[in-house]
Structure formats: C-alpha cells, structure tokens
C-alpha cells in the first residue's frame, strides 16, 4: 500500500465508475477538502483506500477482488493506519464501500473484528421543489461568513465552530473560497451554523451544527435554506447524508425539499 501525493489523486478518478459517487471521496480526489489516498499501485491503481478528514473515516473504491490488496489490507491497518488514526485521537476504524460488492467484501476481510454496521441515507435535491425563504422576524440574526461587515471571530464562542469547520476544510480561507456558510447569532454568541462540508466540480454537501440549547427552534431549517439557495444559484447539485437512526436529520432534509435516493452501509471496529 502506497500513500499518493496530492498531485496524483486524479489517477483514481476512474475507480469511481461503478457504485455511489460519494462527494466525500470526489472532493478529496479534486483536492478541495483535506484527506489522504492509499493505493495498491501508484502508476496504475486498481483499488484505493480514501481517508476523509471531515468524516474521520475511510472509503474503499475500485476493484473489490484485488487479491494482493485484500491480502495486505489488515496488516496495513494494524501497522500504519492504527498509528495514523491514534495521532488524530481516533480509536476506531470506520469505512464504507462504493458498491454492494464492497460491502460484502468488507464483511469478509474484517470478519475477525468486532465489526459494527449501520445504514446511511443519501438525500438529493428534488428539482421540482421551490424555495420559500421569505424574510421573517427571528429572535436571532443570520449572517453569511463572507459578510465582511460582521467580524465572526469576535463572537465569544467562535473557536468551537471554527474547529468544526476546519475539520472539514483545513482552514477557513479554503471554505470562504470554495464553500458556503451561514451562522445564526443570539446576542454575543453563535448558536448555529450551516455549511457546505464537501465540494466537487458539480456537487456540494450540507452540514449543520446547532447549539444544544437552541435546537428544535427552526434555526437549522432557516440556515439551511440560505445555504442551499446559494448552492442552487451556483448551478450545483445538493447532497445530504445522515444515519438511518437520525430521524431529526431525515425530517429536516425532507422539510427542506430533499428526497431519499440511496442507502449504504457504514462499518466500524475498534483499534488497539
């Protein structure tokens, strides 16, 4: 297994010809979001393990029957990936596959692990839907992170949300250049943000973080309307991904106008 240089990421684009076209993977390949890619062969990769920093997890893409790759993957995880993750404060290995065949393969190669699995749901934008974001009075104010009239760094709890965003983007400059972000303010505190988590040439994903004390007040909905309106104006597709158990996220996606389009498995096991 070899770690690719960022300038060579494009070489694995063809490995996504089958299965789910994860923006979380494509954004790494296109060097829009921070991550890492490990392959079986630098010159002619057939199978890849893609690390996404924002998701704090991996994706298998390419040939799921690559015997040499499959033979060595557990050894590679035990000796390299375990250290790679622990340096980031992560004590588990999380992975998804791009195809149903990969899901079967994951079950086989990690059969000796205490493998946990759950379903993830993918929502895409219903093109027949119209956005109704008419101005309304709120107890809070909503600003774009690009609004230079407001110093977002001046809010008392900005550092927390800065950590959330930099996990996905590396630094705020990248987000301002390539992404979208709106935040809600109550007094001198930020109480929620909605942002494009991953960006590809034609798609943006949405992420939301709302202060626990301010949930179930419609803040996420109004922030998301601002973000998705901007993204649609750019002519890009929208992508929403959440756990099957996350009913509030599903309800919000549907309220915004998304429709469920795909499902897939995500897997996890602890590392020692």
Label each region the model flagged.
Residues 41, 45, 50-151:
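Acyl-donor-binding surface of acyltransferase catalytic domains
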Residues 169-212:
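A conserved beta-strand-loop-helix scaffold within acyl/acetyltransferase catalytic domains
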Residues 67-81, 216-229, 251, 255:
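Conserved acetyl-CoA-binding loop-helix of GNAT-fold acetyltransferases
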Residues 264-268:
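Catalytic phosphate/metal-binding cores of nucleic-acid and nucleotide-processing enzymes, i.e., regions
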């Amino acid at each position: 297994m070899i770690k690719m240089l960022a300038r060579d990421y494009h070489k694995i684009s063809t490995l996504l010809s089958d299965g789910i076209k994860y923006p979380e993977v494509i954004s790494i390949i296109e060097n829009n979001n921070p991550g890492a890619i490990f392959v079986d062969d630098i010159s002619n990769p057939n199978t890849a393990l893609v690390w996404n920093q924002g998701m704090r997890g991996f994706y298998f893409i390419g040939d799921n029957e690559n015997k040499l790759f499959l033979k060595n993957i557990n050894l590679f995880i035990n000796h390299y990936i375990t250290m790679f993750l622990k340096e980031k404060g992560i004590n588990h290995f999380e992975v998804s596959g791009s195809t149903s065949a990969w899901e079967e393969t994951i079950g086989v190669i990690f059969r000796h692990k205490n493998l946990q699995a759950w379903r993830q749901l993918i929502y895409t934008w219903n093109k027949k839907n119209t956005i109704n974001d008419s101005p309304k009075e709120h107890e809070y104010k909503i600003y774009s992170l690009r609004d230079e009239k407001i110093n977002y760094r001046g809010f008392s709890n900005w550092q927390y949300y800065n950590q959330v965003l930099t996990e996905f983007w590396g630094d705020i400059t990248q987000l301002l250049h390539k992404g979208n972000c709106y935040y809600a303010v109550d007094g001198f505190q930020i109480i929620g943000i909605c942002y494009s988590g991953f960006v590809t040439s034609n798609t943006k994903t949405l992420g939301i973080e709302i202060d626990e004390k301010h949930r179930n007040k419609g803040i996420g909905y109004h922030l998301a309307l601002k973000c998705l309106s901007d993204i649609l104006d750019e002519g890009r597709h929208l992508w929403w991904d959440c756990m099957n158990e996350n009913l509030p996220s599903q309800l919000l996606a549907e309220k915004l106008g998304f429709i469920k389009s795909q499902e897939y498995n995500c897997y996890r096991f602890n590392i020692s």
